[in-house]
């Protein structure tokens, strides 16, 4: 098993379920740049969850910044939903931009991992294409 901390130190961590890069940008700047780079590859932001704000409103002590972007490529979503409506349970794609130990990270849930249990070659291939675009956007935004 790979040591995720050491992979992150080299700039990118690839686990079975996520792709993570460290960024020197502020959380707000990383969110803005991620939004722009996602548009460049055909994705839009459906919503943003600010977990720090949400948890603090619930009376919980949560100090680190943590934003979760819900992202979608409408054409891809349509194609997937027409192929298998239950795959909608895995939508939209999510990208986390967060702070940990005074460092900032961008992390995406890998579509290939999410689709692995579906056992549908066409969807797996499609997931790889989507993942490549999301990784490209992440690399550009970091």
Locations of regions flagged by a protein language model:
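Terminal, regulation- and interaction-focused segments at domain boundaries
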Residues: 2-42
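Short glycine-/small-residue-rich flexible loop motifs, especially phosphate/cofactor-binding loops
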Residues: 35, 52, 135
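Compact, glycine-rich, soluble single-domain proteins
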Residues: 44-97
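Short secondary-structure transition/capping segments
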Residues: 89-102, 138-142
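Beta-strand/loop substructures that line and gate deep hydrophobic ligand-binding cavities in soluble
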Residues: 94-120
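Well-ordered alpha/beta subsegment
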Residues: 117-142
